[in-house]
Regions:
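Conserved C-terminal helix/tail region of periplasmic/extracytoplasmic solute-binding proteins
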Residues: 279-307
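Ligand-binding pocket scaffold of soluble enzyme catalytic domains
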Residues: 36-38, 158-164, 251, 255
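Short secondary-structure capping/turn micro-motifs that flank functional sites
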Residues: 37-38, 43-44, 73-76, 183-184, ...
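Secondary-structure end/capping motifs
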Residues: 210-288
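Short, glycine-/small- and polar/acidic-enriched structural segments
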Residues: 2-153, 173-176, 194-195
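Pocket-lining segment of extracytoplasmic ligand-binding domains
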Residues: 154-242
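Short, low-complexity disordered leader/linker segments with a strong preference
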Residues: 1-2, 307
Length: 307
């Protein structure tokens, strides 16, 4: 009898290997009956320039919202946001390892913007989805060019389509996007100011035991192998996931940049990287009291990598 595993819903830019593992029977081959459950009913849907501090909104508005009420055993999201979610968790959930996909995010401006370089971003309002990956990515990318006190952000909606619309409508000076909306934005004449790849992690409740996590990772590793063998085939997922959007439906795989799709085997979070990320988040005041040793369930992390 298959083991039932409920995961929070995901998108290709952050969870392509899991989607491939589901669609190609890789989870089933490991004895897992995987169900993706909805999340994010309370996620922001519009820009709010009066909200300029991530502490003003919940870290669980989208990612983790189902897990926190017992609806899912595990979810993946950006590594930084998951540090904060572990600190804020009411269920004792912890990180159990890094996810397979390396997400790609870009900070972009509208075609008529007078901003051409990161240095020109000082005191410009960047709309970001607080506690999601490109929120933190924007800070990391910009602080290499301008002082921290010159980086200005406000709350922007979840979903790159919503943020792109806000950018084109002039509601914000810049925003962050993921694929396929980086490509859509470029086709509309928007400019990429700075971009980078970034890691994510898996956060699990106590419901997720080590053998189940190991089986999950075995399926994901096979999906990684298949994606890396034929990226163009799997880039179609980025179109299909958003095909209700006419702009995306008009794309072909040839329009997407395969270098922005990177997947690796899921793995433990290296201790030195864990510490650096922890220190960086403390430096921004985005972690409060949690100890670095409480961020990860080391036992499940190691056991979950068993072949």
């Amino acid at each position: 009898m298959a083991t039932k595993l409920r995961l929070e819903s995901t998108s290709p830019f952050q969870g392509l290997p899991e989607l491939v593992a589901r669609d190609e029977g890789l989870f089933a081959a490991e004895g897992l009956d995987v169900e993706f459950v909805k999340r994010g009913a309370d996620a922001p849907t519009k820009v709010d320039r009066s909200i300029t501090d991530p502490d003003m909104v919940s870290a669980f508005a989208s990612h983790g919202s189902a897990e926190q009420v017992g609806g899912a055993a595990m979810f993946n999201a950006c590594e930084w946001g998951n540090y904060r979610r572990v600190e804020d968790s009411q269920t004792g959930s912890q990180q159990v390892g890094r996810r397979a996909i390396i997400a790609f995010g870009a900070l972009m401006v509208a075609p008529d913007s007078d901003i051409y370089t990161p240095q020109q971003m000082a005191n410009k309002v960047v709309g970001v989805p607080y506690h999601a990956g490109t929120h933190y990515l924007a800070l990391l990318m910009l602080e290499g060019f301008i002082p921290r006190d010159s980086i200005k952000t406000c709350l922007a909606p979840n979903g790159s389509r919503n943020r792109l619309d806000a950018l084109l409508n002039g509601e914000i000076d810049a925003t962050t996007l993921t694929e396929p909306y980086i490509t859509i934005a470029e086709r509309k004449g928007c400019r990429m100011i700075v971009a980078a790849p970034y890691h994510g992690t898996e956060v699990a409740s106590e419901e997720m035991d080590a053998p189940t996590y190991a089986a999950f990772n075995r399926a994901v590793r096979e999906a990684v192998k298949r994606i890396n063998a034929d990226k163009r085939k799997y880039l179609q997922y980025f179109i299909d996931a958003h095909k209700s959007d006419p702009d995306v439906a008009a794309l072909t795989v040839g329009d997407l940049n395969p270098s922005r799709l990177q997947v690796v085997d899921p793995a433990p979070i290296p201790a030195e990287e864990l510490q650096r990320t922890y220190d960086w988040m403390h430096g921004w005041g985005m972690l409060k009291t949690i100890a670095v040793t409480d961020l990860v369930d080391d036992q499940r992390q190691l056991a979950g990598q068993q072949a």
